[in-house]
C-alpha cells in the first residue's frame, strides 16, 4: 500500500509554517492516541502515520528533501517512522507535544513540571467621577493560594514528601496498549512522583488553601466601561513551584446625572431663556472641578454646541484631556400673562415692519431716479 502525502496526513498546505504543522500534529495525536482508542487498530495506524509525517515536516532538512524527491528521497535517512523502534521513541521525540496534551511527557518527564496558576477576573463598578478623576479601592478576592503552614509542600511542618515507591519518583508507569508500550500517570501518587505520609493539618496535604486576599488597587483616571486592569501575580497559585496567574479587574462605570460621555469628551445639555439667547448671557457651567462662566453670544440658536477645550476626561496614560461640549437648548416661555403676550405681539409687529420699510425705501429711490431723469 502506497504512503499518503505527509501534508495530506496532517491536513496542511505545502506552504504551512512550523507552528501550523505542530498544531496540526497535536490535533492528530490527540485524536488517534492509543489511550483514547484502546484496541482500535485503524487509529493506531493513523497515530503512527501522523508521527512519521510530523517527524519529517518539522525538520527543515528532511522537509526540503521530501519536497524535492517525495517518499523516495527519505530512503537511507533516519527519518519517517522507520527511525522509531517503539512507542517510547515517539513519546521521547515528541515529549513536549504529549506533555501539553496529557499533562506529562513520555516516561513521566513532565509529571512534576511547573505550571502557572489560573488567571482570575473581578468585576468592579466605579462612579462616573471616580472613573474621571481616578481613585484607589480595596478589593477582597477569593483565591486558591499556597498554604502558609507548609509553604505548599503539603506535608506537616518538619516533614517532607517521600519519593513514590510505586513509580520510583517518575510520576508515571508503563502499560502495554496494543502495539505500544505507553506511559500513564502513576495511580499511587497521581503523577506527582512523591507521596505525603504526614499531611499538613491546615491544607490536608493539598499544599493549597482557599482564602480571601485583600488588595489595594489604583484605578487610573479616564477608565471606561470594559477597561481591564492587569495585576500580575495576583491570580491563583501555580503548581509545583509555578508562578501565580494574573488578576484582571474589569471596570463598569456608573452613569452620571449631569454629564454624558463620548469617548474622552464630556457632553452637557443646558437650557436658557429666549431672551438670554437673543441678547447674550454669561452662563455658569459645571465641570469635573469648579463651575466656570461661559459667554452665550447674541442670537444663539437652540441646539448649538459650544466646545470648551481640555475640560473633558483624561486619556489613559497621558496628560491630554478631551473637551467639554455644552449643548444649549432655548426654552420657549409658557403661562404668559396678558402684558407679556402684548409685548411679544408688539415685538413681532416691529420685526415684521422692517422688511416693509426696506421695500418702501427701494420704491422711493426708484421713483426719485425716474422723476429726476
UniProtKB/Swiss-Prot annotation:
Q: Where in the cell is it found?
A: Cytoplasm
List positions binding Zn(2+) 1: 147, 150, 200, 203
Q: Which GO terms describe its molecular function?
A: ATP binding; heat shock protein binding; unfolded protein binding; zinc ion binding
Keywords assigned by UniProt? Chaperone, Cytoplasm, DNA replication, Metal-binding, Repeat, Stress response, Zinc, Zinc-finger
One GO CC annotation: cytoplasm
Q: Cofactor binding mode, per the note?
A: Binds 2 Zn(2+) ions per monomer.
**Can you cite a GO biological process for this protein?**
DNA replication
**InterPro entries listed in its UniProt record:** DnaJ, DnaJ_C, DnaJ_domain, DnaJ_domain_CS, HSP40/DnaJ_pept-bd, HSP_DnaJ_Cys-rich_dom, HSP_DnaJ_Cys-rich_dom_sf, J_dom_sf
Boundaries of every J domain copy? 5-70
Cofactors (names): Zn(2+)
Question: Binding positions for Zn(2+) 2?
Answer: 164, 167, 186, 189
Q: Where are the CXXCXGXG motif repeats?
A: 147-154, 164-171, 186-193, 200-207
Q: Which PANTHER family match?
A: CHAPERONE PROTEIN DNAJ (PTHR43096:SF48), DNAJ HOMOLOG 1, MITOCHONDRIAL-RELATED (PTHR43096)
UniProt comment concerning the protein's domains: The J domain is necessary and sufficient to stimulate DnaK ATPase activity. Zinc center 1 plays an important role in the autonomous, DnaK-independent chaperone activity of DnaJ. Zinc center 2 is essential for interaction with DnaK and for DnaJ activity.
Annotated family: Belongs to the DnaJ family.
Function field:
Participates actively in the response to hyperosmotic and heat shock by preventing the aggregation of stress-denatured proteins and by disaggregating proteins, also in an autonomous, DnaK-independent fashion. Unfolded proteins bind initially to DnaJ; upon interaction with the DnaJ-bound protein, DnaK hydrolyzes its bound ATP, resulting in the formation of a stable complex. GrpE releases ADP from DnaK; ATP binding to DnaK triggers the release of the substrate protein, thus completing the reaction cycle.
Subunit description: Homodimer.
Under the heading NCBIfam families, the entry gives: DnaJ_bact (TIGR02349), PRK10767.1 (NF008035), PRK14301.1 (NF010894)
Q: What name has this protein been given in UniProt?
A: Chaperone protein DnaJ
Q: Which gene encodes it?
A: dnaJ
